[in-house]
Amino acid sequence: MTATLERRESASLWSRFCDWITSTDNRLYIGWFGVLMIPLLLTATSVFIIAFIAAPPVDIDGIREPVSGSLLYGNNIISGAIVPTSAAIGLHFYPIWEAASLDEWLYNGGPYEMIVLHFLLGVCCYMGREWELSFRLGMRPWIAVAYSAPVAAATAVFLIYPIGQGSFSDGMPLGISGTFNFMIVFQAEHNILMHPFHMLGVAGVFGGSLFSAMHGSLVTSSLIRETTENESANAGYKFGQEEETYNIVAAHGYFGRLIFQYASFNNSRALHFFLAAWPVIGIWFTALGISTMAFNLNGFNFNQSVVDSQGRVINTWADIINRANLGMEVMHERNAHNFPLDLASVEAPSVNG
């Protein structure tokens, strides 16, 4: 009888724990994805802060030339970064216990792999937590779908690209200048600016910014005033009110006259779907572009594609970009190889016709 009561008590305790985890009455929703997300993101954040402040230099290229990334080793906020795991490690799983010592683990850039893997799993759990909370509240699942765009982008630069290139040392450094270096080298090796998927991403980001500004300014300019001229129009709004807070007909009329009638949405649902879908689809395409360029399916190459009747090259902007790419290619990792890949396999292309 005692054993039976004990089992009931433990089951009741577990049941209360489950109810607390999945309760939507908590100030911050936890959820089952949150049970995984919280320790993963705390680990990634803690290791990032410690390594950014105090990690010793990392032999990123595997040639015994360590690169400093932390504040205590001479960097500032702009130049500092978590330096990617060494090329000597490649794609091997490199936890602390796989190294002979902590010094070796730090020298080979172990913190980068630790941060990236915990971070990627953590943001995937955050996306799952968004879906889980939407499900509990009876909402539709599109918040998590929208968040999948930045998750896909992060996964592309931190995981898919290193897999395609064969080493975590090719992943994006976790710092400002390191990110710029990653972008420049990526352009040199893959001609990303000439890749149509990157162009779609640019249209998504800049177009999304434009549409967000247009929508916010139109709504703010067509608020229904419930107050006098002597107090803020915002004071006339009550959270949860049934009445609409702005006049969509007025906003539609304004924008329809500013551009033309059919350039303006007259359906709020269609408008907000468009505002969400435009940047999300653009960033999806950019992530897909990074993931294909990871395996060296690169941007368009129009070098020396225009010639005169005598066969002489007439330079275009594509040739100017190619010249810049060659310059960036020969300057990066200049001690890691005798010749850049573009120049070592065949005769260098002419850049002046």
Curated annotation (Swiss-Prot):
<feature type="binding site">
    <location>
        <position position="126"/>
    </location>
    <ligand>
        <name>pheophytin a</name>
    </ligand>
</feature>
<keyword id="KW-0460">Magnesium</keyword>
<comment type="similarity">
    <text>Belongs to the reaction center PufL/M/PsbA/D family.</text>
</comment>
<feature type="binding site">
    <location>
        <position position="170"/>
    </location>
    <ligand>
        <name>[CaMn4O5] cluster</name>
    </ligand>
</feature>
<feature type="binding site">
    <location>
        <position position="272"/>
    </location>
    <ligand>
        <name>Fe cation</name>
    </ligand>
</feature>
<dbReference type="GO" id="GO:0005506">
    <property type="term" value="F:iron ion binding"/>
</dbReference>
<feature type="transmembrane region" description="Helical">
    <location>
        <begin position="29"/>
        <end position="46"/>
    </location>
</feature>
<dbReference type="GO" id="GO:0045156">
    <property type="term" value="F:electron transporter, transferring electrons within the cyclic electron transport pathway of photosynthesis activity"/>
</dbReference>
<keyword id="KW-0812">Transmembrane</keyword>
<dbReference type="InterPro" id="IPR000484">
    <property type="entry name" value="Photo_RC_L/M"/>
</dbReference>
<dbReference type="GO" id="GO:0016168">
    <property type="term" value="F:chlorophyll binding"/>
</dbReference>
<keyword id="KW-0106">Calcium</keyword>
<feature type="binding site">
    <location>
        <position position="215"/>
    </location>
    <ligand>
        <name>a quinone</name>
    </ligand>
</feature>
<keyword id="KW-0359">Herbicide resistance</keyword>
<feature type="binding site" description="axial binding residue">
    <location>
        <position position="198"/>
    </location>
    <ligand>
        <name>chlorophyll a PD1</name>
    </ligand>
</feature>
<feature type="binding site">
    <location>
        <position position="332"/>
    </location>
    <ligand>
        <name>[CaMn4O5] cluster</name>
    </ligand>
</feature>
<keyword id="KW-0813">Transport</keyword>
<keyword id="KW-0157">Chromophore</keyword>
<feature type="transmembrane region" description="Helical">
    <location>
        <begin position="142"/>
        <end position="156"/>
    </location>
</feature>
<feature type="modified residue" description="N-acetylthreonine">
    <location>
        <position position="2"/>
    </location>
</feature>
<keyword id="KW-0408">Iron</keyword>
<feature type="binding site">
    <location>
        <position position="344"/>
    </location>
    <ligand>
        <name>[CaMn4O5] cluster</name>
    </ligand>
</feature>
<keyword id="KW-0793">Thylakoid</keyword>
<dbReference type="GO" id="GO:0010242">
    <property type="term" value="F:oxygen evolving activity"/>
</dbReference>
<feature type="transmembrane region" description="Helical">
    <location>
        <begin position="197"/>
        <end position="218"/>
    </location>
</feature>
<feature type="site" description="Cleavage; by CTPA">
    <location>
        <begin position="344"/>
        <end position="345"/>
    </location>
</feature>
<dbReference type="InterPro" id="IPR055266">
    <property type="entry name" value="D1/D2"/>
</dbReference>
<feature type="transmembrane region" description="Helical">
    <location>
        <begin position="118"/>
        <end position="133"/>
    </location>
</feature>
<dbReference type="GO" id="GO:0009523">
    <property type="term" value="C:photosystem II"/>
</dbReference>
<keyword id="KW-0597">Phosphoprotein</keyword>
<keyword id="KW-0560">Oxidoreductase</keyword>
<keyword id="KW-1133">Transmembrane helix</keyword>
<feature type="binding site">
    <location>
        <begin position="264"/>
        <end position="265"/>
    </location>
    <ligand>
        <name>a quinone</name>
    </ligand>
</feature>
<feature type="site" description="Tyrosine radical intermediate">
    <location>
        <position position="161"/>
    </location>
</feature>
<feature type="binding site">
    <location>
        <position position="189"/>
    </location>
    <ligand>
        <name>[CaMn4O5] cluster</name>
    </ligand>
</feature>
<keyword id="KW-0472">Membrane</keyword>
<dbReference type="GO" id="GO:0016682">
    <property type="term" value="F:oxidoreductase activity, acting on diphenols and related substances as donors, oxygen as acceptor"/>
</dbReference>
<keyword id="KW-0602">Photosynthesis</keyword>
<keyword id="KW-0007">Acetylation</keyword>
<feature type="modified residue" description="Phosphothreonine">
    <location>
        <position position="2"/>
    </location>
</feature>
<dbReference type="Pfam" id="PF00124">
    <property type="entry name" value="Photo_RC"/>
</dbReference>
<keyword id="KW-0249">Electron transport</keyword>
